[in-house]
């Protein structure tokens, strides 16, 4: 038999598909990250080992700021190429919506590297606006204000504009326009107004319904005309600088984007014809990420286009319609959150233990006085072959059901039930092995692989670190970071350490459609086994919750240079005391309460003084320890 190779693992986990040259496998069989194309590769297994020496335990979120920089450069170069190809004569701007990942180090890295690429920020709420105004110190950088707005939100934005910030207030509802007009008059400011238009066009994929007629935000054509009349009556006609549309996140089909662009471009033309000299067309989110590496519109976790194609269509559509109507090319703003941030973060956790369905030991002999159902089932297993497997499967199911029924009525004992159980699952395994080798296996056998998968219990919380996996069945690339020069010998689902049955991952990227198990290796007693989840830089950190009071994981920032990699920053995960404080438990008060109780227990002779001290010491150290298993 041919020896398993690294190339086999690359194909099995499709790392060349979703990795987009950032992720690969080295000669040691370890996953490597190459933040800069053709640059230094970071060995994730060696990185985890080094972090262990620094007392940074898994689970750990590893951020690669250089990937953020590379994504910004990629977007900018695509615009530059498209502008040259289609004769685009205006400016393009990239906007990062901080809702995608509001973590300060992420936002600051994007701002820092994005200065020379016309990169600005979008705020979708009052708290986000407070952050954006303070961290975005470049006066030439755009700030776009979306979301619901009250007077204090609008006043903050207008005063910031008055002091030199390049801020646009995007009207989502008609009442916001009236508030803007009122506050602008009070503050003596000529506001930069944008209007979000509700297109008939919608996106595709999981977020299809967030666009189109049923979308939450935006003005209809009738409301737009009302808004235009209002602005003209209030002397704000020249303040309308921008139109905005959004057809949904993670649009899987480029045709939907093309359709929306054509529709939106006509609004730009019509507004110019009515005397509103709009300068910016703000294309909302939608630029997707190929999570499964299939480049297919049939998968909600993929897209059938590249960044370059997305940009080409955006520029060519608006250039064409502008030239035909003799109006200036608009400045184009593209909102890119997922496409900028997804690749830069990797979650790594350790497998703690496994659970496998029982099986019959080949050397185990059936006792002469064994229950007749056990003997019958053993006979089925002993004589199983391809020709008989469908009949054997039906018989095995019937015998198992009969045995369970008899056990429930107290007729068969526990030992008999256990024997039936082991024989049944052994038969199921053998049937599955035979069926997997058949070109046309019976439909009844299709779900057996999923049924037989091991459970790998992992030191992480799905709800904290991968909320989209639980909430919307988002599929992320997942694979071991080591032993990839060995053939995986087990199939498993991943279980987290919360006490919730939903805390599991049972859908994985496969070479064909979606797999219900992950190929993994048997655990070794002397070697920790690590699994990584990739492309988690968008939304996951900020949406994560504290189910079972599991807090933020440890996080590290890793940069690369000519000589290798450097761990720039280590951010400790939350302690037990910190998460308890979130839910209004005072850690100091908890300790005092326990001290009183322990003192009472010692006086009553329930425990010794030393035991009391040991208990309190453990409690105090646990309070200020990691929320995950150590």
Each model region followed by its residue ranges:
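A non-catalytic, amphipathic alpha-helix used as a structural packing/dimerization or gating element
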Residues: 66-74, 226, 263, 313
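Flexible, glycine/charged-enriched surface loops at secondary-structure junctions
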Residues: 58, 62, 84-89, 274-278, ...
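Low-complexity, highly charged intrinsically disordered N-terminal segments
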Residues: 20, 25-102
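Charged, compositionally biased N-terminal leader segments and the immediate start
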Residues: 1-31
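Charged (often Lys/Glu-rich) extended helix/loop segments that serve as interaction or gating elements
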Residues: 305, 313-315, 319-630
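Active-site-proximal beta-alpha core segment in soluble small-molecule metabolic enzymes
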Residues: 87-282, 287-289, 293, 304-309, ...
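Short, glycine-/Ser/Thr-/acidic-enriched flexible segments
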Residues: 30, 38, 67, 101-103, ...
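Short alpha-helical segments and helix-capping/turn motifs at coil-helix boundaries
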Residues: 7-9, 73-81, 104-109, 129-130, ...
């Amino acid at each position: 038999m041919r020896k398993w190779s690294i190339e086999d693992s690359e194909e099995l986990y499709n790392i060349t598909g979703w990795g987009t040259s950032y992720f690969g496998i080295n000669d040691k069989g370890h996953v490597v990250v190459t933040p800069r194309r053709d640059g230094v590769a970071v060995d994730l297994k060696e990185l985890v080992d080094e972090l262990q020496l620094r007392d940074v335990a898994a689970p750990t979120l590893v951020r690669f700021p250089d990937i953020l920089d590379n994504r910004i450069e990629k977007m900018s170069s695509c615009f530059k190429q498209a502008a040259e190809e289609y004769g685009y004569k205006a400016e393009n701007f990239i906007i990062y919506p901080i809702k995608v990942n509001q973590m300060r180090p992420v936002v600051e890295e994007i701002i820092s590297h994005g200065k020379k690429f016309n990169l600005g920020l979008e705020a979708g709420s009052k708290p986000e606006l407070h952050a954006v105004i303070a961290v975005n110190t470049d006066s030439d950088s755009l700030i776009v204000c979306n979301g619901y707005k009250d007077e204090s939100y609008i006043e903050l934005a207008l005063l910031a504009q008055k002091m030199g910030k390049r801020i646009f207030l995007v009207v989502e509802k008609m009442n916001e326009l009236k508030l803007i007009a009122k506050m602008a008059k009070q503050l003596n400011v000529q506001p930069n107004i944008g209007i979000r238009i509700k297109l008939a066009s919608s996106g595709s994929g999981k977020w299809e319904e967030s666009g189109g007629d049923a979308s939450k935000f935006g003005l209809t054509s009738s409301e737009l005309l009302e808004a235009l009349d209002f602005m003209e009556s209030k002397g704000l006609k020249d303040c309308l600088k921008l139109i905005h549309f959004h057809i949904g996140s993670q649009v899987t089909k480029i045709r939907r984007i093309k359709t929306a662009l054509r529709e939106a471009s006509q609004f730009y033309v019509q507004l110019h014809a009515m005397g509103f000299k709009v300068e910016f067309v703000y294309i909302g989110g939608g630029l997707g990420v190929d999570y499964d590496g299939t480049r297919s519109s049939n998968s909600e976790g993929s897209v059938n286009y590249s960044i370059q194609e997305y940009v080409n269509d955006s520029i060519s559509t608006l250039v064409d319609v502008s030239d035909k109507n003799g109006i200036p090319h608009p400045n184009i703003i593209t909102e890119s959150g997922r496409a900028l941030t997804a690749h830069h973060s990797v979650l790594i956790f350790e497998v703690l233990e496994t659970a496998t369905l029982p099986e019959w030991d080949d050397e185990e002999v059936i006792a002469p006085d064994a229950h007749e159902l056990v003997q019958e089932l053993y006979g089925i297993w002993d004589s199983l072959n391809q020709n008989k497997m469908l009949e054997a499967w039906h018989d095995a199911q019937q015998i198992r059901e009969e045995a369970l029924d008899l056990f429930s009525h107290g007729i068969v004992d526990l030992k008999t039930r256990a024997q039936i159980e082991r024989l049944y699952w052994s038969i199921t395994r053998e049937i599955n092995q035979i069926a997997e080798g058949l070109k046309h296996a019976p439909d009844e056998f299709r779900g057996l692989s999923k049924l037989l998968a091991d459970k790998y219990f992992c030191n992480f919380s799905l709800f904290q670190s991968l909320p989209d996996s639980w909430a919307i069945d988002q599929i992320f690339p997942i694979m071991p970071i080591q032993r990839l020069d060995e053939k995986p010998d087990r199939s498993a689902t991943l279980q987290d350490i919360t006490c919730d049955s939903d805390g599991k991952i049972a859908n994985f990227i496969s070479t064909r459609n979606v797999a219900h198990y992950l190929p993994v290796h048997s655990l070794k007693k002397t070697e920790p086994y690590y699994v990584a989840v990739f492309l988690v830089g968008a939304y996951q950190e900020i949406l994560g919750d504290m189910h079972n009071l599991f807090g933020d994981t440890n996080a590290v920032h890793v940069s690369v240079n000519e000589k290798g990699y450097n761990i720039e920053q280590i951010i400790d995960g939350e302690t037990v005391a910190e998460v308890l404080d979130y839910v209004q438990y005072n850690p100091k008060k908890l300790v005092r309460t326990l001290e009183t109780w322990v003192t009472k227990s010692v006086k009553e002779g329930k425990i010794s003084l030393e035991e009391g001290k040991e208990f309190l010491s453990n409690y105090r150290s646990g309070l200020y320890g990691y929320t995950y298993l150590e």
